[in-house]
Regions:
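Short, surface-exposed loop and linker segments with low hydrophobicity and enrichment for Pro/Ser/Thr
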Residues: 102, 111-114, 220, 224
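Charged, glycine-rich active-site and insertion segments that engage polyanionic ligands
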Residues: 1-49, 120-121, 127-232, 236-302
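Conserved catalytic/switch belt of AAA+ P-loop NTPases
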Residues: 108-124
Length: 302
């Protein structure tokens, strides 16, 4: 692990970031919450030699809140920006955050700009998922890696092993989980329910199962946090399945998996793994809604 202006990153990522020193297209690629946007701003500031605030040579493009996409209008703004001479630096720098939310037409327009402006501008694409091949082929890929738990301990005091596991080694995601009202306790209570085979625990911690409160949990926690919760539950049930089958497995923070395996049949565990895996796919495809969330919880609680 190394730090970049006080932020912790995998050593391989820091080495690649320090090598960004000339115009071109760079794609910062990795899971959400791993620090890509912050790294992009650090690199942009280094290349411009001055602060980004009110800097005429810097442009940040991100999804419009209403549509949650980056459209062709945004790329037209980028054409205007790159078509003007740099005011204070040798070149201009643009960061496109959530670049994987560029529409196909916007990506094609971006491709045209990359062909015309090669060597004259720095464009950093911050992406959690892949872009179209023709755009990616023109970018220098800089992968971002998650940190090991021991590395996280170096930068987070009193590291919670359960949250570290949930976050997948992403410092930013870890902090989001801790800051989200009641999220960590919700997960811990759910694990307690699974360990004891007691429905009441889950119903108490997820009171939204009651019809009158049906929207609360889903509106309180954004989709990445819910996906992490679902993914972790799938891993827990998979380890319960291994234990019930007599196969040894590693330690899982927050739950005694051996104890939990006493409360479930192998068929019910297999069904839970299947339901949770399907929920993960639906979240990835953008098809997961509140009804799916509650149907999933009811299935696991039965």
């Amino acid at each position: 692990m190394k730090t970049l202006k006080g932020y912790a990153y995998d050593a391989r990522t820091v080495e690649a970031l320090q090598a960004v020193n000339e115009p071109g297209v760079y794609q910062f690629f990795g899971m959400r919450g791993i620090g890509k946007r912050i790294a992009a701003e650090i690199v942009a500031e280094k290349m411009l030699g001055s602060r980004l605030s009110a800097n005429p040579d810097y442009l940040m493009i991100s999804p419009k809140e209403k549509n949650k996409v980056i459209g062709i209008d945004d790329i037209e703004d980028l054409f205007v920006f790159t078509g003007q001479m740099a005011a204070n630096a040798s070149y201009k720098v643009c960061v496109i955050d959530d670049a994987d939310l560029l529409t196909e037409s916007a990506q094609n327009a971006l491709l045209k700009l990359l062909e015309e402006q090669a060597g004259q501008v720095v464009i950093i694409l911050v992406a959690h998922r892949h872009l179209i091949d023709t755009v990616e082929s023109r970018a220098k890929l800089i992968p971002f890696y998650s940190l090991q738990r021991e590395e996280m301990k170096e930068v987070i005091d009193d590291l919670d092993p359960l949250v570290a596991e949930l976050s997948g080694g992403r410092i930013g995601f870890y902090k989001s989980m801790v800051a989200s009202n009641g999220y960590v306790q919700t997960v811990k209570n759910a694990l307690k329910f699974i360990e004891n085979g007691n429905k009441a625990d889950l119903f108490d911690c997820l009171h939204v199962i009651r019809e009158k409160d049906k929207a609360s949990f889903y509106e309180t926690y954004d989709l990445p946090l819910i996906r992490a919760f679902v993914s972790f539950l799938r891993q827990v049930f998979y380890k319960i399945l291994l234990g019930a089958s007599g196969i040894e497995f590693g330690f899982t923070p927050g739950i005694d998996v051996s104890k939990a395996s006493e409360h479930y049949s192998i068929l019910s565990i297999q069904a839970a793994v299947s339901v949770l895996s399907n929920a993960e796919r639906m979240i990835s495809d953008g098809r997961f809604n509140k009804n799916d969330w509650f149907d999933m919880l009811r299935f696991i609680a039965e």
